[in-house]
């Protein structure tokens, strides 16, 4: 048995309007068409649905039950239309973002606040890790988009779009700087991120470019740990400028002067937006990308 939805709609309109004539006018159909719909329902279910001799019409028990259930059907229909319409406009749904550690900690919140303001009904989850881990999550379908530090080599299925540049600055604790000569950076202890992180890759590029070969390296799993070890005076590190500005301002850290080391105490890297090349860009991902690329920093 298939429900005749047009007949159900006519039945509900008769009950709500109180008469066949008003129901016909509201639905822009003839009164005989309304009567035919009611007869069709009564024949289908083999029950009498209403007493037509009264105005407004009086429903039987079966009619009351059908009216309640039909209203539920049409209310669900409205919810479906509204929900899917809003999803097509990126106003509902969920977005899973993968962000490398520095971006998740220091960049992303500014843009998530604005995105949530524009699309308050969208659920957001953020997974963080080093850049290789984020690329793996993307390929496994565990995130919708990624924002990472640097490129991902040898990954043809990942599309990379440059988002912005970030400066990493060579810093140390004031007492470390006072107690060590900067003429031989290879002899000093370096604090670095783990293999696979964008920060570790850029630090290695800096060391290679300047022919620095540290004899002692301490590797840790996140930039906050690097920062704390540097503050404690354990060694040198390249850290994101956005992360150390206040520490330098409060004299907890110092930027190594170029005059002491004979080279620029910083290096720039690209922060990138990554998606899968074969995945269709949904309106939700498109709108998050628009916020990320175009909403200005305060």
PLM feature spans:
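Conserved amphipathic alpha-helical core elements
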Residues: 23, 41-42
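A short LG(V/I)-centered, amphipathic sequence patch enriched
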Residues: 42-61
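A late-sequence structural motif
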Residues: 107, 254-298
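Short helix-boundary/capping micro-motifs
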Residues: 12-30, 95
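Hydrophobic hinge/microswitch elements
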Residues: 130-135, 139-142, 149, 203-256
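Central regulatory/effector-binding core of bacterial HTH transcription factors
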Residues: 92-155
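Secondary-structure junction motif
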Residues: 149, 178, 188-210, 280-291, ...
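Flexible hinge/capping segments at coil-to-helix
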Residues: 157-195
């Amino acid at each position: 048995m298939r429900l005749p939805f047009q007949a159900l709609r006519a039945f509900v309109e008769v009950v709500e309007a109180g008469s066949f004539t008003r129901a016909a006018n509201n639905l822009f159909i003839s009164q005989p068409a309304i009567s035919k719909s009611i007869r069709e329902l009564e024949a289908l279910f083999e029950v009498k649905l209403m007493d037509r001799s009264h105005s407004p019409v009086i429903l039987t028990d079966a009619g009351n039950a059908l009216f309640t259930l039909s209203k539920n059907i049409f209310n669900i229909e409205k919810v479906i239309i509204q929900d899917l319409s809003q999803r097509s406009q990126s106003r509902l749904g969920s977005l899973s973002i993968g962000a490398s550690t520095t971006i998740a900690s220091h960049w992303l919140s500014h843009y998530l606040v604005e995105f949530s303001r524009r699309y308050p009904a969208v659920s957001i989850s953020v997974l963080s890790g080093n850049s290789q881990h984020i690329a793996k999550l993307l390929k496994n379908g565990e995130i919708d988009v990624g924002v990472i530090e640097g490129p991902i080599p040898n990954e043809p299925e990942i599309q990379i779009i440059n988002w912005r540049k970030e400066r990493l600055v060579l810093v140390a604790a004031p007492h470390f700087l006072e107690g060590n000569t900067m003429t031989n950076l290879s002899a000093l202890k370096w604090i670095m991120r783990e293999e696979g992180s964008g920060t570790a890759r850029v630090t290695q590029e800096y060391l290679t470019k300047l022919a620095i070969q540290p004899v002692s390296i301490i590797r840790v799993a996140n930039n906050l740990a690097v920062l704390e070890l540097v503050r404690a005076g354990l060694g040198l590190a390249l850290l994101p400028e956005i992360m150390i500005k206040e520490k330098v301002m409060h004299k907890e850290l110092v930027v190594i002067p170029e005059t002491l080391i004979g080279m620029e105490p910083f290096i720039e890297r690209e922060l990138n937006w990554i998606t899968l090349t074969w995945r269709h860009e949904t309106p939700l991902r498109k709108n998050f990308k628009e916020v990320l690329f175009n909403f200005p920093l305060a």
